[in-house]
Amino acid sequence: MKTKTYERLTSLHDKYGPQEFGKLCQKFLAITFQMAGYSRIVERGVQGVDIDAAGESGEKYAIEVKTTVTKSINFEKKDVEGLQKRKQDGYQPVLAVLRLDRFSDWIFARAQEIKPGSLYIDSLRVHRLRELEAGTRPLFDEAIGNHFHRTMQEAQRYLDNFLRQKGVEVRRL
């Protein structure tokens, strides 16, 4: 990620804390997929798979989003089960991990190849979906740049409203 993106994400993390930060990043990722041209996106602020994204050319991703400031994440059994359910509908299960670090970017990993538990982030590299990462990386930076200031003021409410305006289905409690 660009240095400016890192600085903005750090500001969001400092203001809102790790749990809310994770939800904000999930919404930024949904915006990123919308910018990438995915036509059918569902973003869930409730239990279950975090994001479904389907493209015009038939690609379908069910995405479990994890954010951290450490070198590992917890990939729970419930995450695996939720992704498996979406796989039955033709979605490719993806584990998306963002470590808030100066030189980090999203890692998109083929989740069906990963066992639940505490996972060292670097261990996910062998499972990466490099094309998906490359196609979304610059758009994530752009999404942060476009929506940072309003998100600092209004957090999830602003991002939810923006996503709905763009035709994304937002599911909340």
What are the residue ranges of the model-derived segments?
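Acidic-basic catalytic patches of nuclease active cores, encompassing PD-(D/E)XK
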Residues: 1-43
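Catalytic cores of nucleic-acid endonucleases
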Residues: 8-16, 20, 42, 60, ...
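Non-catalytic C-terminal interaction segments of nucleic acid-processing enzymes
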Residues: 32-35, 112-173
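Conserved catalytic cores of phosphodiester-cleaving nucleases, focusing on short active-site segments
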Residues: 33, 51-53, 57-69
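Alpha-helix C-cap/termination motif
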Residues: 36, 54, 86-90
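Beta-rich catalytic cores
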Residues: 47
